[in-house]
Amino acid sequence: MNSKKEVQHVYLVGAKSLGAYGGYETFVYKLTEYHQNKENIKYHVACKANGDGCMDESKFDGVTKINDHEFEFHNAHCFKIDVPQIGPAQAIYYDVAALKACCEHIKKNHIPHPIVYIMACRIGPFASHFYREIHKLGGTVYLNPDGECEIIWATRQKPDFMR
């Protein structure tokens, strides 16, 4: 009997950083802090590399720098996404680039049955592409029901309050 537990890899997309910006960021910080000693869970956290709300890992104790765009914190692999300064479209760009990076990491490292958790769905029409890609890689996608797209992209119409 194999006593080695299989590691569950969980990719977190949608927070700009860990604990320094808002609700999603605090959630990710606390989640990784709580599970940092669990050997059977490995978190991979997308972080914004530049601009408003970007990740500044130098403000945290216990960070192990891997390179300019990757570090370990709370036993989580954190990777930074460069985002062009393109106004409100930054959020969409960031989520799409983060999901692309997750898929590349899963492929490159042959990660079995990964979980990708999207905290804020700002990817709209790109969602089905990434769902298919992640499912093809043997993964599961979870979308936060409090994300920002449920009505807009489900109906393809803007509610009255958004017109």
Whereabouts are the PLM-identified features?
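N-proximal low-complexity "stem/linker" segments adjacent to membrane-targeting elements
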Residues: 2-5
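Local beta-strand N-terminus motif with an aromatic residue
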Residues: 7, 111-114
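N-terminal strand-loop element at the rim of the active site
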Residues: 7, 12-21, 34-89, 122
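Short, well-ordered alpha-helices that flank and scaffold nucleotide-derived cofactor binding pockets
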Residues: 29, 33, 37, 100, ...
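A generic structural motif
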Residues: 38-44, 111-112, 138-139
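An aromatic- and histidine-rich active-site surface loop
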Residues: 90-101, 113-139, 143-150
